[in-house]
Curated annotation (Swiss-Prot):
Binds 2 manganese ions. Isomerase that catalyzes the conversion of deoxy-ribose 1-phosphate (dRib-1-P) and ribose 1-phosphate (Rib-1-P) to deoxy-ribose 5-phosphate (dRib-5-P) and ribose 5-phosphate (Rib-5-P), respectively. This is Phosphopentomutase. It catalyses: 2-deoxy-alpha-D-ribose 1-phosphate = 2-deoxy-D-ribose 5-phosphate; alpha-D-ribose 1-phosphate = D-ribose 5-phosphate. Pathway: Carbohydrate degradation; 2-deoxy-D-ribose 1-phosphate degradation; D-glyceraldehyde 3-phosphate and acetaldehyde from 2-deoxy-alpha-D-ribose 1-phosphate: step 1/2. Its EC number is 5.4.2.7. Gene3D superfamilies: Alkaline Phosphatase, subunit A, Phosphopentomutase. It is found in: Cytoplasm. NCBIfam families: deoB, PRK05362.1. Mn(2+) 1 binds at residues 9, 324-325.
Amino acid sequence: MRVVLIVLDSVGIGEMPDAHLYGDEGSNTIVNTAKAVSGLHLPNMAKLGLGNLDDIPGVEPVKPAEGIYGKMMEKSPGKDTTTGHWEIAGVILKKPFDLFPEGFPKELIEEFERRTGRKVIGNKPASGTEIIKELGPIHEKTGALIVYTSADSVFQIAAKKEIVPLEELYRYCEIARELLNEMGYKVARVIARPFTGEWPNYVRTPERKDFSLEPEGKTLLDVLTENGIPVYGVGKIADIFAGRGVTENYKTKDNNDGIDKTISLMKEKNHDCLIFTNLVDFDTKYGHRNDPVSYAKALEEFDARLPEIMHNLNEDDVLFITADHGCDPTTPSTDHSREMVPLLGYGGRLKKDVYVGIRETFADLGQTIADIFGVPPLENGTSFKNLIWE
């Protein structure tokens, strides 16, 4: 038996009760995107029950639905990829990751400069493409490292490959990771951001590398691998979990590549396993850029390929589709939004047309997957296997 878990990065379905604390009242990524384009065409997710979850223009409610459906609330504080995925896997954060809207503290930057032997420029929240355009020439002249953050808990280091060789950049990231941990700053990811080319047409290269914080507790991935059930990550799963509990990981170029790799794993791995896929384009390419038209198109492209995924399920396999947070492209904010996420499930062993309600935590999904595999339970979450199992 295989479980295929697909996270549509940032595809939220309505504000959380505490959204006002995050400045996210009124956010509803799916519904507002559908309104912006006068209706979404998502017939395959509609069949599973997506239209039963909210009033989504173009996505009709279907009775009886072919799948199980519900929504999940986020119990952890925060609204980012790491927090969302950890919670799906059973780890609930007590305190949120640190954010640096004013840049990093002076003593941290000074110590980082001392340990790397290079000066730091930037030190502010910025768009990666904009900051290299702004500071690239100074970096080329002086060899100073471009350090910046975003609305997420990240410490990013950009450097031109011809000025700072890749291995050296990665070493600086390791220094930053150690230093943040030592000084007690809870930063989710340190990210190497190499670029090349000439000003003003610098291009970021694909050798981006994440140096993530390890999950604060045992995840579903740890429990599965400890019990002999491999976990195959597609996309940035290994980065999110700092490699822990991931048997093999397959990096992706874009959503379609992620779907291709998921399908080829389904064809290839005929043993008990979890195939855990993150499709990130919704978030990085369209949500943050407030581009509802392209966001809608990406949702429709995923939906059009859903039958291929379903066609490759064996009789006892289970497919779950969910998200990790919101990123409403129709609101003035370019940041993530604090939202509930949709949950759809399908498989030969699952009942049809079951509404699993609004779950109190994303961890209910991880707990259910642990229950399906018959491994020891996770620390958090309530399994709903009894509601959905034939």
